[in-house]
Amino acid sequence: ISEFAGDSGVDTVLSRRWTALDPTAELQAILAINRATNWEEFEKGLEDFHAPAQNFVFASLDGTIAYKANGKIPIYEDGTDALLPLPGWEKQYEWKGFIPFDELPKVINPEKGFIATANNRVVDESYPYHISNVWAQPYRYERIYEVLVENDSLTLDDMKALQMDAVNLRAREF
């Protein structure tokens, strides 16, 4: 991507590393996920889904519900902010590996009886790894949560309506 660097007068080239450019096995993952009959099989299928990182939700006929933030997410040295380009020739900015699969955020059968996700922040400051610098604002998640908490029994039509819901919680703040 160095042709986009402009003429800075410095002998520096740019490069990019992204997990989605590595060979992966998403097709096998999707096949396994589609064939899964329980959470364990579903999660096993996710082991082959590396990029791009995704939020996955699961529900089975036995009532199991689950969520997993999944993908190969690089680990950087403490304090490294990978939002902007880094001087990749410096060893401190090399990837130190990936967040272990069994340590990726997940929720299985939460006490509240439902799962809501809308690209919102899914971990707090106690989570030992950096997942992202960019999260969706919480309003859409909060609206989904609000609707689910207020209703004990939702129909398919209720869920369709929630998909088209135009309530703007941010507007309520004003």
Label each region the model flagged.
Residues 1-174:
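Mature extracytoplasmic enzyme cores
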